[in-house]
């Protein structure tokens, strides 16, 4: 019996060693410049998932290419578990552009292949689209898997620009970005199939819907979407991508200075994603709560710390309210109110080393200065806020 126990222990140690060696091999297979590494990778038990730096470079490269073409895009980068890692919505983009970027990335991730292949299958046989939809796949080009040294580390999806292949398309934008960031190992694009012609086209008149004058705003131009972008969404008071990225950068640096990490979402005043990022070592709960905080602060028009304090001071009715109306009461969500005008909301999750709300405040102060409204707590010994 003792011999059997020793043999079992020996086999267990051998298996553990094999797992450790396997993890080390995976870690060595993908250069650290592209994936979460070190203690952050040990924390999430994954040495093969895309890091924030790579995701940010891919998004920025795609946006630069789109700007050169005179178009706007939305770009979403996922890790190999399907979590959001980095997201940007260029000014003037709307809901459909944003959500399809996410859908394309998820389709590429699920199939480990370009989302165009799903589109091509549907073009060849339209009866297959229902099955693809039932599987949660989106039959459109613009989603590509992110593969380094034959290891899937994530996926990217781009939406929002009118396709004009072979000159320009969402997929071309994503491919250019991957080639610039990952290198020449990125495979060439799949062939484009011509769309199937409608045998019985209709002749219904299509109305135009264009405002005669661009929307007006009293806010500084640096803070909000302007020009043609504002005209596209009929709103001159949406937070701009540039302002959102400044807020996020300060929050990220502040968290790092506290030896912490965070996940962050910034949404516009319609509740649509503008910018998102997940620092290395963050997991699903951190990411998802950041989104919930931003959405809650937008819906309630107040920081999530208000309900958090109320829950501690007098919980009567709070559970009912939060459940019925899908609110989240942890601190870290703040509506972005500039010169009295709400232009969006921010949500921070994951701790940030010194508190999620504090991280959000640092980003807002650095970006908007005295223009922004921030939560103010009573002095020690004063009446607690209701």
Give a label for each model feature.
Residues 4-27:
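Gram-negative bacterial Sec-dependent N-terminal signal peptides
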Residues 28-386:
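Flexible, solvent-exposed loop/hinge segments and secondary-structure transition points
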């Amino acid at each position: 019996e003792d011999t059997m126990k020793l043999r079992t222990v020996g086999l267990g140690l051998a298996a553990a060693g094999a797992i450790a060696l396997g993890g080390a091999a995976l870690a060595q297979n993908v250069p650290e410049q592209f994936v979460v590494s070190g203690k952050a990778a040990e924390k999430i038990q994954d040495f093969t998932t895309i890091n924030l730096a790579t995701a940010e470079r891919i998004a920025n490269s795609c946006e630069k290419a789109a700007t050169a073409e005179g178009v706007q895009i939305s770009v979403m980068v996922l890790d190999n578990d399907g979590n959001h890692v980095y997201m940007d919505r260029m000014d003037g983009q709307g809901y459909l552009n944003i959500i399809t970027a996410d859908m394309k990335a998820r389709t590429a991730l699920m199939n480990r292949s370009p989302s165009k292949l799903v589109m091509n299958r549907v073009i060849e046989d339209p009866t297959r689209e229902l099955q693809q939809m039932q599987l949660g796949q989106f039959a459109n080009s613009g989603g590509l898997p992110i593969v380094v040294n034959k290891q899937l580390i994530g996926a990217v999806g781009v939406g929002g620009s009118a396709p004009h292949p072979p000159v320009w398309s969402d997929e071309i934008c994503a491919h250019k970005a991957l080639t610039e960031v990952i290198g020449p190992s990125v495979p060439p694009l799949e062939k484009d199939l011509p769309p199937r012609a409608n045998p019985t086209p209709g002749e219904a008149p299509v109305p135009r819907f264009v405002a005669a004058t661009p929307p007006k705003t009293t806010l500084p131009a640096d803070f909000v979407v302007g020009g043609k972008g504002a005209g596209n969404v009929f709103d001159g008071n949406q937070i701009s991508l540039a302002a959102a990225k400044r807020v996020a950068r300060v929050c990220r640096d502040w968290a790092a200075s506290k030896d912490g990490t965070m996940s962050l979402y910034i949404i516009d005043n319609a509740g649509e994603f503008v910018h998102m990022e997940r620092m290395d070592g963050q997991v699903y709960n951190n990411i998802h709560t950041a989104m919930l905080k931003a959405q809650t602060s937008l819906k309630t028009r107040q920081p999530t710390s208000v309900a958090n304090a109320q829950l501690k001071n007098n919980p009567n009715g709070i559970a009912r309210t939060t459940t019925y109306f899908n609110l989240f009461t942890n601190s870290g969500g703040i509506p972005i109110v500039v010169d009295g005008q709400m232009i969006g909301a921010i949500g921070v999750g994951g701790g940030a080393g010194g508190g999620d709300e504090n991280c959000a405040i640092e980003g807002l102060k650095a970006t908007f200065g005295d223009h922004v409204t921030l939560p103010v707590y009573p002095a020690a010994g004063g009446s607690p806020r209701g």
